[in-house]
Amino acid sequence: MNEQLLSKKNVVVTYYPQVNYIHIDWIGFQREQEIYDSGEEVLQIFQKLDCHKVLNDNRKVIGPWNKAAGWTQDYWFPEMIKAGLTHFAWVFPDNVFAELSANQAMPDTDIVHKFMDYNSAEQWLKTVTS
């Protein structure tokens, strides 16, 4: 059974044990401090799980969040990798400003793969092994 691990106005995190990944569903306009706070909470959750895969869903993100893009790329991703992240499927938003921010935050690593639709991202995570 799926387990909701975090629910805030800007993000919902759910663990899917049958396929062993966490789904991070970002919602609405993302304020800089909310990204930092929620990102830290996601990191703490991930550190406690025996899980190595993330489905990062930006389909519901509205507007830019570029002020936190550097932090995401330079701090959050390295910390997630230290915590055991091996596969990160990133579903990009349709919103052009949110997409620009996501592109800025995307690290140069084989761990992170960009997808334009949810089903392709989910299918990829189900086929990769940790």
Task: Enumerate the predicted regions with their spans.
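Amphipathic, Lys/Arg-enriched alpha-helical "gate/interface" segment within cytosolic domains
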Residues: N2-S130
